[in-house]
Amino acid sequence: MKEEKWIHEGLITESLPNGMFRVRLDNEDLVLGYVSGKIRRSFIRILPGDRVKIEVSRYDSTRGRIIYRLRNKDSKD
């Protein structure tokens, strides 16, 4: 049986080494997030200020996997 994960949206506040980021969730929690393999393979750039979807485990709510970068309304990419 696969573990159930919670999916939240948040804002990248800080970029850390090795594809790790500090993410402030919409509920004001601070989570350490790492980039998923699919995003890493697709060479998707994630920068501070980007909004992302992050998958958080029920058992450790301080870490999560960044699974999607949301498009900014004002950007042209």
Swiss-Prot record:
Location, primary (coarse class): plastid
Stored NCBIfam families: infA
Coiled-coil annotated residue ranges, if any: none
Keywords: Chloroplast, Initiation factor, Plastid, Protein biosynthesis, RNA-binding, rRNA-binding
Subcellular location: Plastid, Chloroplast
Organism: Borago officinalis
Molecular functions per Gene Ontology: ribosome binding; rRNA binding; translation initiation factor activity
S1-like domain ranges (all copies): 1-71
Subunit structure: Component of the 30S ribosomal translation pre-initiation complex which assembles on the 30S ribosome in the order IF-2 and IF-3, IF-1 and N-formylmethionyl-tRNA(fMet); mRNA recruitment can occur at any time during PIC assembly.
InterPro entries: NA-bd_OB-fold, RNA-binding_domain_S1_IF1, S1_domain, TIF_IF1
UniProt-recorded name of the protein: Translation initiation factor IF-1, chloroplastic
GO cellular component: chloroplast; cytosol
